Amino acid sequence: MRARYLLDTNTVSYIIKGNPPAVRQRLLRVPMAEVGISAVTQAELLFGVARLPTSPKLRVAVDEFLLRVEVLPWDSEAAEQYAGIRFDLEQHGEPMGNLDLMIAAHALALEAALISSDRGFRRVKGLKLEDWTRA
């Protein structure tokens, strides 16, 4: 099954930390087969772990999360979306960080809703965006 919901890095952090609780509660109402993360998000999570080598609890929590969720490869369809989004945003003088652009492009390529509380994603035309931090 293709992911219906793509979790961004901040959303995954909320899930791992358990705060805000609304995010975990919403996740529990969705079949895990419909949830995924981008390989870009996986890279960001692993970078966060590498930055805190003295936090074995964080490493365990991230590893356990990655075992439970499908990590979706960033592919040529996502690359096509990335080019279009980046061009559009730069034309309007509204640049976005490359990793966020890659995650947004991945969600568009998958036709999935991006789960994020980051309002910057609202600038991406056609992106289905859901904020699970609000109950």
Task: Give names to the regions the model predicted.
Residues 3, 70-115:
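Active-site neighborhoods of divalent-metal-dependent phosphate/nucleic-acid chemistry enzymes
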